[in-house]
Amino acid sequence: MKHILNKDTERQQRLIMLMFKDDKWKSAKYISDTLECNIKTLRQDIEYLTTTYEDILVCEYLKNIGYKFLVKPGHSIQEIFLDWINHSLFFSIITDVFYQKNKDDEDYFYNTYFISETTLKRQVAVINYHLKELGMSLSLSKMSFKVQDEFVARMFFGNREMEKRSIYDWDDSQIENQGYAFQLIELLEDFHQIKLTALQKNMMAYFVLCSVVRSSGEFYLEEDNTIESPLVTDKNCYEVLLSFKNPISCSSYLTSKIQINDTLLFLDTFFIKLKENYTSDLAENMSEELMQRIADKMQTDVSVFDKELLVKDIGYILFVRDKYPYKMSYINHRGYFNSVAIQIKYPIFYQAVMDSFNQLSKDYAWLAHYAPELMNSLFRYWKAQDYGYITKINQVKVFISTTLNENQAKLNQYIFEKAFKNKMNIIGYEYEQTSFNSETTNPLLEEAELVICNHLFYQELDKIIVVDDIIDDAKLYFINQRLDKMRKAKLSV
């Protein structure tokens, strides 16, 4: 990462990853120690991020507690990462060479990015450092890619295109090609008797486009081109592939049967291998074990999951592990942030899933490497009619006690229910308590798992939280942490 982003931006990326790791407040010392920078630099980074991305990011500060990052409504932290990617010389060079924008211009990169020959050489060296494990390199003299495995190269280029933007948000110049990609995918689904998930279909569209671009440049899967796809004679497939247009020249990308056949061979291989994994016993068994472990911990039935969709996602992971066992993302971390969002909003579900990954059979233990991506799948595939269960499971029984009047007790109840939603079940309250009328024999005190009060009359109990008459954000944060800890402790072993 440090080779792709400059030193300051790389540190700012780690700062964002750390701050959104969970919803805990973090002290300046903890953050600076973790990032290995001084507190002055940390404050400068926070100031830079919240100023540069003021429409996206907010930083809150509480004395004696620390900092907390929040994303403004209607925005995503991904927007910052996408901005870095789209302004990165690393990605810009790879993109321009891929689309052959420099094909007829030796000075293209100097004139486009106003860089020196030394800078270009250094950046090419960085690119080759990252591409080496894929069997790829960028020739400095020709500024074109050398590729050992064209299938791997197309997977890389597809992933790179996805990393530059939202999977669903295509560049305006490629919108028509996106439509053609979806048409072709549907034809391939029918031919291979396979149905992709919605997310996989959107991802596949990028692989289709990148394959078309590579075939148009005559970078073929097979040097002799003797193998013919069974779909090359399909009129519909042929016409759709002829429709892909180069947005710069407005001419067709593919102009020959050889080029069309090459792209179809790539897609045939993709679909055949994907179908093998979709229908494999391994994908089925892994899905069943994972779902059963989670269902047991959530104290529910395995039928709450859409098994068919999960099998497809695990099948896709098996395909990727076999055909592209390399880094999928260099800067963007969609799966990570989506997983963190689930952790913050649905901590019990998150913990149940993570514990289940850690307890998988030895042969399946490697699947935990894909936990962030599958966390999102498992959440999406929990059937909608049962979502209420995710939020309400393991509610903590809370009793409120105050020395003030009944109105204050009701106000506290309102504040807690508003702040903690489904995390607690308030079973009752008492008011105007004194050392003379407070009784630990109150049956509700016995039933309660947590007692929140503004006095010490029940200090012999090990389940109290003492608050001030006016409850501040710091105390609400502490109560929230206590609730999450208690709810997680209730998970089935």
For each feature predicted by the language model, list its residue ranges.
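A cross-family "folded-core" feature that marks the main globular domain of proteins
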Residues: M1-V493
